[in-house]
Amino acid sequence: MSSSFFKKRLSPIKPGDPIDYKDVDLLKKFITDRGKILPRRLTGLTSKQQRDLTNAVKRARIIALLPFVNPEG
């Protein structure tokens, strides 16, 4: 079995850049077509960036900037 089952993506976020919950275009890059947050091994983010991203996505969902689930998939 090949070890490159998952394709690792290069992060569009630089280490010092803040992740803003109002930046919906950036957040959509880290969400699947069904609305799930991509894991860190696929996004290439640091652990702190992944935590900040998760909080930003959850906050954006609560204030209806992002859907909780995308049924169209």
Curated annotation (Swiss-Prot):
PROSITE patterns: RIBOSOMAL_S18. Pfam families: Ribosomal_S18. The keyword Transcription does not apply. GO terms for biological process: translation. InterPro entries: Ribosomal_bS18, Ribosomal_bS18_CS, Ribosomal_bS18_sf. One of its GO terms (molecular function) is small ribosomal subunit rRNA binding. It comes from the Bacteria. One of its GO terms (cellular component) is cytosolic small ribosomal subunit. The keyword Nucleotide-binding does not apply. Keywords: Ribonucleoprotein, Ribosomal protein, RNA-binding, rRNA-binding. Belongs to the bacterial ribosomal protein bS18 family. HAMAP family: Ribosomal_bS18. Part of the 30S ribosomal subunit. Forms a tight heterodimer with protein bS6. Binds as a heterodimer with protein bS6 to the central domain of the 16S rRNA, where it helps stabilize the platform of the 30S subunit. This is Small ribosomal subunit protein bS18. It comes from Prochlorococcus marinus (strain MIT 9313). The gene is rpsR.
